[in-house]
Amino acid sequence: MMMALYSIAPASTPELEIAALQKELAGLPAGERIAFWAERFVGTPYDEYPLGEYVRKNVVVADERVDCMYLTFRTVELALGTDPGDSRRIALHLRFLHRGMVENGRVVNYEDRFQYGEDMIESGKWGREITSEIGENSTVTGPSGKSATFVPAGLISQSPGSFRSGDIVFFVNPPEKMAGGVIVGHIGIIKKETDKIYLIHASGKKERGGSVKKVLLGDYLSIMPFEGIKVTRFPADVQMPE
């Protein structure tokens, strides 16, 4: 498939164009579609609102500003949907511990949303965990007693076969930062290009700003403040429930 290079974030993209792109991408594996949509958000401003703009407005789509969790939500929804409406339907499944509910065009139960990356992993909704395939695993236990198995930063394999486009990377906090038992401190998405592995992530801080960036994974690993990573992967032909 010949694919044009798109770099305009969906926030400025009419739904008809999104629908056309979704149709064009339909034959690609899920991971390739996820990476494609993630890259379209590069340059999008970071969402500085503490709970997220989408939660504040009680909406499904709020593409003008994104944080790492919304970027993950929206990228996967666009990748797995057959059209914009289908992506919104998928959002009500993927973003929630149970299922989202919409009344009069507004989400009415965002208190049921995933708020922690570790819960996304454990739910099984966000792909199969492949942490053990990325490198030698270790275990960390925070002050609350909650523990997590992960790949330490220095043991993460960056061989050509380790990651695939569309893999979701959950960055594990060091024990001293696991306040309240929060294991995952950041989330990003992998994009592979020949022999290079990139991380696409919403780089910023609440109330300080930032933007979505695409960086070499190795470069980010060398400076990141996290202990290591956990990784999930969707099957190539993933099917969403009705």
Across the structure, where does each feature detected by a protein language model lie?
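Short, exposed beta-strand "edge-strand" segments with a Pro/Gly-rich flavor and a Y/T-containing core
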Residues: 7-11, 26-28, 143-155, 206-217
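N-terminal capping segments
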Residues: 8-141, 146, 179-180
